[in-house]
């Protein structure tokens, strides 16, 4: 991935389609903008005598603003700033994020001295437990056993629907941030209705994939084929580490199931169409138009027993999921649930699980990998 080196300021756009910006207007704009920025950033320093403001130190006064405003506004910063080790990009926003991170860590460190049982101490203890790899190693899979035992109790498709419903997550945002894929088989987002502005609607969005995108399962690209092989190996290895026999066969079944789910899902481009927000289904529509899933069991376990109306963002994904629940062997679904229970919590399982999860993360993501301390902080927040 190309390194992004962000000086933290926007550049003025060049004139479009040959349009001429009058010099007087440009000069007035630059003077007003520069004066406002200087005033807003330098007042505190001028009052306490600490010397040049942060903004003034980023400026290269040797450059005439009208010739190259970017070089004028950022030249000093670019000369004095180097890219920190392990970072692909660095700018004022990154500096602020790092400053906030250090402050949060300090707060958590202080919270470790709070009275036992207090809210602050519980937060600090959570982070400390995440970092205590020796204790994690000693516990083995004990913390995961209740989840795996719950999967073992699934004896029919109604029980399966309940367990799938329990896994619904509010981790999507189709209208705002364009998040069209949930970690659960379906994601929920409550957003403003497009027809009744004073009302909110319950949006249902596709999910259920272990890889980031449907194309990771369906594309014939050699890189995607290699990624699928890597993912299958992760499934096999985690099931093996957890003590499940026939792990190779189980891994193939899980990958085949996720591939089938992906085939019915919407592409990124199709999912980005806001006309999807106009597809309203009642509870009875799910029963009639997406047979195969016990929707009453699913929604009840998801905590949506009283919700009667939904906006379905990707219709084919819902009907496809229901069809897979109806047709796919129950044991394949149970292996799917077993693997995802293990993978979801791999970072707080013994080192072999965490290492395998990190290896898959490296295969699917670019950029520097977060340290355990960074992952612990993210989990705590």
Residue map of PLM features:
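N-terminal secretory signal peptides that target proteins for export/translocation
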Residues: 1-18
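Bacterial N-terminal signal peptides
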Residues: 25-38
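Boundary at the C-terminal end of the N-terminal hydrophobic targeting segment
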Residues: 44-46
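Short, Gly/Pro- and small/polar-rich lid/capping loops
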Residues: 48-57
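A charge-rich, low-complexity, intrinsically flexible signal that marks solvent-exposed coils, linkers
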Residues: 56-57, 62-65
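Active-site-surrounding "flap" and adjacent substrate/cofactor-binding loops of secreted or lumenal enzymes
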Residues: 64-68, 72-135
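Noncatalytic, helix-rich "gating/capping" subdomain that lines the substrate-entry/channel surface
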Residues: 111-381
